[in-house]
Amino acid sequence: MRNDPFQRLGLDREVLTVSQLNQRARLLLEDVFPQVWVEGELSNLARPASGHVYFTLKDSNAQIRCALFRQNALRVRQALRDGLAVKVRGKISLFEGRGDYQLIADTVEPAGDGALRLAFEALKEKLAGEGLFASERKRPLPAHPRRIGIVSSPSGAVIRDIISVFRRRAPQVELTLVPTAVQGREAVAQIVRALQLADRQGFDALILARGGGSLEDLWCFNEEAVARAVAACATPIVSAVGHETDVSISDFVADVRAPTPSAAAELLAPNAGDLQQRLDGLRRRLVLRMRDQLLRERLRLEGVARRLRHPGERLRQQAQRLDDLDMRLRRAFERQLAVRHERLVRLETRLAAQHPGRTLALLRQKLDSLAARLPRAAREVLKDRRQRLEGLAQTLNVVSPLATLGRGYSILLDERGRAIRDAGQTQPGQRLKARLAEGELEVRVEDNHRTPVTLSLLD
């Protein structure tokens, strides 16, 4: 015979087991509350494979766990979701295994939109009206960040997932965790302070991250204070709150929304293929620039050669200028090669961390070969121009008056240094200078016959 649940314990201090206590409590609750209607807001909705539905029904001050078994869940037409306001009919009971007080529901009816959803939509409309969601405000993420701040909880899988992605894709990126609570009463204030602190550290980008959870668990990211802190950040920020189906106010305000924290890391981790493509582009630009510079210098040297019209000092000046151009061109090549080589070394270091392997080695060999060939080509061109100049100098020397003097001829000059070309330009007794190949003679005109003189071609 079953004990009366309302029977008080005797004065002899009857001792109950935990199972007996929970059983009596369950019978008492089911007897007093065989059927009740309760209105509240759904949260922590769970649908296991059994077909049963478990959820929490709450208002602003309290909450109760509820169970809707499969045969009753099939009759519910309304799609249940977190934040939905409903009216639930059922009996109050107690799950003896855990001692949990609960409502066994048999009917669930909608009671209008939940308070959290209404608050979400109201804040979303307000901030959108202020332009905080506008695309013009969105800043692009850096293509190759060096330092990234992560605003998240220091414990849990989120930070481990983010670190794992960066170790795999971009181990050279420096990650800094700015710890904060992401759930609970203190979460909003801590998140705001963490964002303000991170924004002052000079990071290239920020990740605001949290794992999945119920609407209540994620609610701090729907608070106005957090949204305005995100909007105030001068640093580009990626919001990665919850799972792919979760959407928060911070997602709308941030520069980029990522469906998961791992996806946020993928967005900011440089891709090895992009770096390889950039290296190829730099190599092509280097080759084209060197060719262009070599062509300009060659044209310049040709112009110098065309302007060489006079012997002697003019020729020496141009030869000196050619030497100067040679040295400047060499220095320019060496300087450009040093700058490009240093830049390539930096890129190679970054690529080496991502194991590009044999492709990078082959590219480096090819680039070294090009770098070695360019100076040799420049030296060959300069050598050819120098030989042409020497040939011109020899030609000019052949037709030079000084060469004529060297064959035994002389040049007569009057007192003013003017050359005497005709005997009629002189007077008997006039003193003249005779310039020879080596030295000068003082001579005097004895007579000035204007008889034509025939010179031997063999002289």
Swiss-Prot record:
CDD domains: ExoVII_LU_OBF. NCBIfam families: xseA (TIGR00237). Keywords: Cytoplasm, Exonuclease, Hydrolase, Nuclease. InterPro entries: Exonuc_VII_L (IPR003753), Exonuc_VII_lsu_C (IPR020579), OB-fold_nuc-bd_dom (IPR025824). GO terms for cellular component: cytoplasm; exodeoxyribonuclease VII complex. Belongs to the XseA family. Its EC number is 3.1.11.6. Its main location: cytoplasm. GO terms for biological process: DNA catabolic process. This is Exodeoxyribonuclease 7 large subunit. The gene is xseA. Pfam families: Exonuc_VII_L (PF02601), tRNA_anti_2 (PF13742). It catalyses: Exonucleolytic cleavage in either 5'- to 3'- or 3'- to 5'-direction to yield nucleoside 5'-phosphates. It is found in: Cytoplasm. Heterooligomer composed of large and small subunits. GO terms for molecular function: exodeoxyribonuclease VII activity; nucleic acid binding. Bidirectionally degrades single-stranded DNA into large acid-insoluble oligonucleotides, which are then degraded further into small acid-soluble oligonucleotides. It comes from Pseudomonas aeruginosa (strain ATCC 15692 / DSM 22644 / CIP 104116 / JCM 14847 / LMG 12228 / 1C / PRS 101 / PAO1).
